[in-house]
């Protein structure tokens, strides 16, 4: 879509100089008609006193017992479900991958300290996996799955561990494979969901692989916590199959309890995920008071095709909600996160009237729209369950009941005011590391802890414990900029889809506007207009790139708005000859493609064009890494003059790295204040990140004419801005791909990170406003 400001930036006809270089005699496209800007329907700027502030992100692979030998940093460790000691100071999380629980000191929320781990092997059980934890008094109850893959004979136990010395003082056989645990508010009993989960690779008679029934059925264990732990005993609560059948549950003969929550009356709510049901149990007597279906929902305005496009015109028909996490809103309403596991999942969350079982409110497509607005849509899950809400917690903030909904695939927690359960109000979105599952409010300290389970060391994706603080007292230590720092506006009720922003350019016609583009993570290619006069910055236009009247997909790694109108794109190819400068008219149509000289293209490896800048008669480009024929660590900067079609090349000495598997390259180039600015980065993130910087290079006079076998003149560089402290200031994982920067017409320096479309990445986009370039950049 084109808008008035997009038109002004590209309105002029293409100058004869550029037309000659483009080898075309066609007239430049006329200025497109003015159209309305997209606007954001959400007020993102809550007062500091009314929002959460991210305090810290602690990667749990760093947590090990004091004095223990170093562990393999690449070994998988996760943080799935968390609890906290009654004083609110020690978080305890499950790590099923490493078969242990971990302890983290959060007395200073801005500086979590790992207190080590307790392996189940140390308790004498080498192959058992913790599924949940709950602290009560001086103890923590550790729910352990001992099934070991024998689905037909599930087993489990709950260990009672004294926190002070981490010794097990008691263990209770649960008689089945457990999932979650909850403690009553008065501390008198615990409820444990015994799921006896299905084997997704087993085929029941007459059914398909992974189907139910797969006996034995699940149940709930109630544990009386009166007296010393050695006196604690459990009581099994079975469900009435006939009642489940009458309620319309799927496969009532094989129920699979997933999650439990207890209200102030001692009622236990149980989600029966695969059966698409909810049960309510009297925690004191063990009587099953109610079973009802979670029902179905049809959802429209969502992306249901994994085709590389964020196409929100899709829908799903009436689909079982299949709730995972469940929580009480007061004593009369229940909230569920409708993840889905077998046949369903509706991409949102629902509030039920617990008395009638009727739906009081449903999120519809709003959770997915929230992901799209904030660049957290995961295209590779479009045909499955989209953002996949899984975790949920209910807390109270400033006297207001508040729901916290965790999106497992889009990596965020959404905050809602549920003072009126029939009309929740969205308040805030919190970024997390991948796979947030444990959502742990600590009301006594106005803290929130989120534990994330996805851990892929090879991709730099690490499981973590993230800490957020609510209110003014945590604002000063909160991450800056606050998330989201860039969002998209809505067009006809749907947000502009975006992500994987790998480029920035100033708008020559508007001092408060920038241009950016998505790379090959999404297609077809578009140039996005960004209004930086707002906070957060707002993507409010999307200009499709076309060729011969048809949309095209390009790996756009650089965008330069031409002073005379139109754009130049740096397009990276899978192979050297596919790297091109693409000249685009104001209406998005491709005017010309300019290939790199064959001598250069043939010397490229997997990385090529990564940045572009344009002034009145020159185009500058950055090649990400060295040519095969160039000295190690010397990348190239190129100068192209459209008037004569000539290329001149210069050398640029990259910083070095000693980290195995790491490399350093260029990601952006700009012309500013009579010099070239280049962005240099390594491929590391989080605590490992070392090189994220802008360097200044004086504009050179002479260089090498196209030749790849002639050593280029290496240009002296000078550090202009170390970006690593800016990226670390968010209090999240320092992002790997800082790939775009620009000095806007208002003189400010802006920087953006590429979130890789959430594939093998945590997906958080950081958009930095670093203030006036004259101050932000060293001379």
What are these regions (language model features)?
Residues 2-10:
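Bacterial N-terminal signal peptides that target proteins for export
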Residues 25, 36-779:
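Sequence/structural signature of beta-propeller domains
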Residues 18-21:
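C-terminal motif of bacterial Sec signal peptides marking the signal peptidase cleavage site
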Residues 23-30:
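Bacterial lipoprotein signal-peptidase II cleavage site
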